[in-house]
């Protein structure tokens, strides 16, 4: 498959995922709609991610053998540490989120993202729905590094996007290169009461 056709196929999968998120948001999607999307994603990953395909074949699962989305093999956590699991070339990924490495510091798990549009779309709706269903913005104090300090941290991305999209005046990051800004946190809390 050429790079152009891979890109076209990847863009179609992405568009369909974004449409699904837009359509269903935090509502329960019909089983048929979720099943169709999960199968589409699985078929794409099976075709373009050799290491995942090898794992699926060892489990005797192919796109043709699926009876429903629950047959799709989840990759064990160690797979993200030992394998390169991406359906597009690593060099074309906008972001690579990594685990903290607490169990194996020299062998951190990696999660590759061609771009962050789907990730961002899947984050903001649930955040608004579950954290702040009755308001547009809230004061947010982030006590961990911002995205600018930790480009490999999904939590850093999550909290940065939450603050950008939902934070009101007075929101901020209180963890900097020198560590936690205790005085800043104290001022933030004093203003909150």
Model-identified regions with their sequence ranges:
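Extreme N-terminal, non-catalytic leader segments
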Residues: 50, 54-68
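Alpha-helical scaffold segments that form or flank carboxylate-/histidine-based iron centers
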Residues: 32-42
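Generic detector of short alpha-helix boundary/capping microenvironments
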Residues: 33, 48, 87-88
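Serine-centered coil/turn micro-motif
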Residues: 49-50, 153
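Active-site phosphate/ATP/adenylate-binding loop shared across adenylate-forming ligases
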Residues: 3-27, 59, 68-193
